[in-house]
Amino acid sequence: MGNRLGLTALLLIVLVTIGKAQTSYQKTDSISLALFNASEWQKLVTYGKNALNNGEDFPLLRLRIAYANFVRENYVEALTQYNKVLDHDKHNQIALYYAYLCNAYLNRDENAGYLASHLDSNVVEGEKIRSFKLTDVGAESGIKFTNIYERGNSTFSRAFIDMRLAYKLNLSASYSYYNQPIHNDNISQPGYYAKLNFTPFRRISFIGAYHYMRSTLRQLVYQNNAVLAGIKYAGNGSDIQGDFVQSQIGDEKTRQYDLKFVKYISGNLNFYSISRFSLVNVLQENNLVFQQLFGVKPMHNLWLEGVVTLGNQYNYAEADALYIYNGFDKTKFKAGANCYFLLKHHLLLGLSYTFERKSDNIFKFNYLQHSINGGITWNF
């Protein structure tokens, strides 16, 4: 008899608990839907977070919170919710589509491509999403000024093309030319660069790059090359990338180990930072190089960046080995500013200034170098 009474009491407790949970769910669902329909985005975000903290967690609530953040252009918070939905239902088309847009608006083209590969065909056709797509073409050119006779003004030019070969595979390729007067001679250096980005998972990408440079100095020809291999993890509000670069520059072998952090501080590209730590092993020395960049969007379609690089940058590879500092001298300090203006959605104009403190590689005298660079990119 006692066992029956105990079992009955337990069943009553379970039924009451379930009833309260259902009532709580119905209330949360009703209020969040009303806020959603009324376009009360900030109130919806606040209410939804409180509901989640109280254990009231269901896909529709997260989708509503995510969309409220998306409308407010907080793509990081929106992605946080969409990724939670996809963790439990990887085929949810609403979460896939808006997560695709969030990644695209954060310039994560490789992650956006992965998500596009899982969209229904009617969505792909309606949005005109293509697995093979030419994404960008452009060019940049600049000049470097020095304050000493022994080093003339050098020039740099580059033309590039970016494309998506498949939803999960991206290619960047470019041709560059660098020229630097050295006393009574010149360093002339054409270069070819290619980078593949493969994204087999929603958050993880593998990176491979190759850079070839042919340098001519005093009738000597050097076949220089650099190879990069890396992995990148795309978090909700930040990216982490680790990579390794091995290069043969002239007669010198260089090994470089990088760790890069990208933080979307404002939840979008209105305020962001990029921190990069590098260990460069060259000439039997280990040089630590640290680079810090902050970017801000002060007005519509305009971005400003400030960047500083500390450490001995001899044979230093930057931007996934796109830029190899194969100069005659060592760079000890570098700081600069970049400006980008988006004109009519497709045309991006860029202008940058760089200040460098350099040291002669043989006689050890110091000098300053100033650089001005301009670029143009057409986005398809």
Where is each model-derived feature located?
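Short, charged beta->alpha transition segments
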Residues: 81, 125, 193-197, 226-232
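Alpha-helical protein-protein interaction scaffolds
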Residues: 22-131
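Bacterial Sec-dependent N-terminal signal peptides
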Residues: 1-26
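Transmembrane beta-strand segments of Gram-negative outer membrane beta-barrel proteins
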Residues: 127-145, 164-173, 206
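Outer-membrane beta-barrel strand-turn architecture
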Residues: 106, 163-169, 198-204, 233-237, ...
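Surface-exposed strand-loop-strand hairpins of Gram-negative outer-membrane beta-barrel proteins
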Residues: 143-160, 173-183
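Outer-membrane beta-barrel translocator/channel fold
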Residues: 176-191, 209-227, 242-259, 264-367, ...
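Generic helix N-cap/helix-start motif at coil->alpha-helix transitions
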Residues: 22-28, 56-62, 91-96, 152-153, ...
